[in-house]
Amino acid sequence: PGSWELQGFDSPIYTDVAYPFPANPPHVPTDYNPVGAYVREFTVPAHWKGMDIFLDFEGVESAFYCWVNGELAGYSEDSRLPAHFNITPFLKTGKNKLAVKVFRYSDGSYLEDQDYWKYSGIERDVYLYARPQSRVQDFKLVAGLTNGYKDGDFNLNITLHKPHPGGTVEVKVMNKGNVIYQHKKEITSATDTLFAQKHLFPAILPWNAETPNLYTLVVSTYDAQGKALESFTQPFGFRSVEMRNGMQLINGVAVLFKGVNRHEHDPHHGRTITVESMIKDIQLMKQFNLNAVRTCHYPNRYEWYALCNEYGLYLVDEANIESHGMQAHKDGTLANNPDWEVPFMQRMSRMVLRDRNITAIVTWSMGNESGYGKHFETLYDWTK
């Protein structure tokens, strides 16, 4: 992955407030709108037979179409969130061909007018993965504190896709390699898609930026014969976030946030960031006693959140919504335009659904420099 402007194609553009093209939403230039074409062949492993196969783009700027063996697999916008396509129907035995058409500008660019260098291309990882047809569709973990912030209040909700009657869902919580909680539930019917589990963990070690104590959630699914179908892990910490008397409290303690805004930017690769550079950023922040980071002004690579969990940094997670250039437009903002309500909501809701299980996130941000309008009230109400 990388920004094509730093790979020998086209030129990067820096703008502060103004759009890099005349503002006329939702229209974008037709005389200058570079397009990147990517083609790659791949072979699907034989042992993936019978499974659903997904194609994942972690971040493409600013919009793209993709085809598998000449069949349109999908279209996506929002340069900073992943796009997942179920490509199972388009695959064949042997070699397969993937083609991607990336547009530098799209109508989504009106919501991506951040004050920074403007780049384009496939800027985050792209990968294939296979999952069983009977699988965990989604999960929500809330791990708070109770009884004077001493005990852990564990609440887990799992949604299943095509559950197999007679199969089981197993939940484990581990601490430093030791299982401290385990529960199994049998799937009773094909409509038994919801799994909820609550548990009180006495005298847990809470998570905060100074002592980022992490536990590990392990979720596994099995078929009716006891064969393992799938297993995944989610590191998490027990912590509470609340507002009291105008102060934000973490685990009942008022915290002074000493933070920075951090862009994803590399002088050689543009918007493509390595895990090694993320760790260097965190080490530098810790060296100067910083404890908070705002993902200005868009969702970051998912690895960044895992590192903030591990090293201990409070996160303000920000939606990829900035329409700074609209302040010079007669409308002033897109936040009151009915045509833009769905794009606003998609960018906020997709971010929250991706990141809601991240312990380090203590604040959700609805965007940056986009004026005020009713769409932000809608986003606020949905997020709450």
Task: Write out the residue ranges for each language-model feature.
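Low-complexity, Pro/Ser/Thr- and charge-rich linker/hinge segments at domain boundaries
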Residues: 123-140, 239-254
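Accessory carbohydrate-binding/adhesion or oligomerization-edge regions at the termini
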Residues: 1-19, 97-105, 178
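Active-site mouth of glycoside hydrolases
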Residues: 79-87, 107-111, 241-384
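Surface beta-strand/loop "capping" patches
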Residues: 133-163
